[in-house]
A protein has these predicted regions:
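ATP-dependent helicase/translocase motor core
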Residues: 1-82, 89-97
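Conserved helix-turn-beta segment of the N-terminal RecA-like "Helicase ATP-binding" lobe
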Residues: 109-127, 199-203
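Short glycine-/polar-rich loops that comprise or flank the Walker A/P-loop
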Residues: 99-101, 146, 173-176, 190, ...
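Conserved helicase/translocase P-loop NTPase motor core
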Residues: 55-76, 121-144
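Inter-lobe coupling linker of SF2 helicases/translocases
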Residues: 130-145, 153-157, 161-174, 179, ...
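Conserved Walker A/P-loop ATP-binding site and its immediately adjacent core
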Residues: 90-93, 99-119, 186-190
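Catalytic acidic motif of RecA-like/P-loop NTPases
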Residues: 84, 155-158, 183-185
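PAPS/PAP-binding and catalytic site of the sulfotransferase fold
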Residues: 92, 187-199, 251
């Protein structure tokens, strides 16, 4: 039997009450779902953390909090904001919050930039170029003690059949991985899948509920494309459909990606604080080129080969 005291408690001390409107219940549901991120933001004094001269921008601090949550849940996260939104700064702020030894792997031309940025944010980390994977593997102390691996331009490792991918996979084994790229996928689903395999087991994944075999999931999507002729309408439509499935089933759980349009819509105050305006892109205009006979012949031959 249900006691009167139990009924009284339900009616007066919970959200299951007649005077609670559906919209209020909806807001309460949102709060309960996102309260970790909301409360986490209150725990950080970003102005104390940021180096002198760096602005406290909400779109960057939000990304740090979300990235840490994803990293803890799945052992890896994609930071894939479009170009120009400060992915390196977001990574440096994230690294501040992570306890444990860190390794940054980046293109040689960006090595000095990464080292300067991490120094500005008072982050201790080993920075190595993409061409030094062998040196990393040979450093037993480093390999034993690394807890986090940051990979800049991670899209370079889309092909698991390459030697560099195999070396990187060995480096990342049993580590938490941060993949930094604005272009994680090119054409095939395997582009994104191979990068995910750097931090998730193929046959024991935790990303898709009730579907541990993520290799089979991506294999089915790639199989749909391989049956079609590249360049056809059906191929293009299938490619779009595959991308939507991947976004809905996989990337929404492990990727942070904001476009300039989204920043303008949801973080307008940040843009005003920076005095930043994104350029308005005009519609493309057709430009006709004229070649002499020899160049035109070479051009046409090249197009046919492509």
């Amino acid at each position: 039997d249900i006691s009167d005291k139990y009924i009284e408690t339900i009616n007066e001390k919970t959200w299951i009450r007649d005077d609670i409107k559906p919209y209020e219940l909806f807001l309460k549901t949102l709060y309960e779902y996102f309260k970790e991120e909301i409360n986490e933001d209150k725990n950080y004094d970003w102005d104390e953390i940021l180096p002198d001269g760096f602005m406290n921008l909400q779109y960057q601090t939000d990304a740090v909090i979300q990235a840490k949550k994803i990293l803890d849940a799945y052992n890896g996260v994609f930071i894939s904001d479009v170009v120009g939104l400060g992915k390196t700064f977001i990574c440096a702020m994230l690294a501040q919050k992570l306890k444990g030894r860190k390794l940054v792997i980046c293109p040689p031309v960006l090595k000095d930039y990464w080292e300067r940025t991490l120094q500005q944010f008072d982050v201790q980390a080993k920075v190595e170029s993409l061409g030094k994977l062998d040196s990393i593997l040979e450093d037993n102390d480093l390999m034993k003690n690394i807890k986090y691996v940051f990979i800049d331009e991670a899209h370079r490792f889309r092909n698991e059949k390459t030697e560099s991918f195999q070396k990187l996979h060995e480096i990342c084994y049993n580590k938490k991985v941060v993949l930094v790229t604005a272009t994680p996928q090119n054409n095939f689903s395997s582009d994104i899948a191979n990068q995910i395999y750097l931090f998730q087991p193929k046959n024991n994944s935790t990303i898709i509920p009730n579907n541990k075999n993520i290799e089979r999931f991506f294999g089915k999507l790639d199989g749909r494309l391989k049956k079609l002729e590249k360049g056809t309408v059906e191929y293009t439509e299938t490619l779009k459909d595959n991308s939507e499935i991947i976004r809905d089933k996989v990337l929404r759980n492990i990727m942070i990606r904001r476009t300039r349009k989204e920043i303008m819509e949801y973080y307008k105050d940040d843009l005003e604080k920076q005095g930043l305006k994104f350029p308005n892109l005009e519609n493309p205009e057709k430009i006709i080129y004229s070649f002499d006979d020899n160049i035109e012949q070479v051009f046409n031959h090249t197009i046919c080969k492509i």
